Amino acid sequence: IDSITQAVVKDNPKIAERKGFKNIFVNAPCVVCIAYDTTYDMAQIDCGLLGENIILAAWSRGIGSCCLGSSARWILDSPSAKPYLDRMAFSKNYKLLYCIALGYPDESPEAKPRRQDMIKFMD
């Protein structure tokens, strides 16, 4: 986690300017990287369902999570991170889609208020 963070920050130093920054995975101690089959048109949906199951299973064990699209984009866009991406050894035609940060929560923030103006019920 630390070395891939250093590689990404080398190419994009502004990332490290965030308050409390430790790594590109929201300071999580563990990360799962999800890759999709670029030849299958429903692969991204399947990966979303996979991630949901990982997140729910982790929560049932008291482990918090955060789904991260930006971390995956930073890795894909960073030439310095290419060796780490290569070490992930995804199968042919597979591409990194997103990451899931995992760890024991150290806070319990209140839920944000729901925007009722964004909800529409239809009969």
Where are these regions (language model features)?
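Acidic, surface-exposed loops and disordered segments
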Residues: 1-123
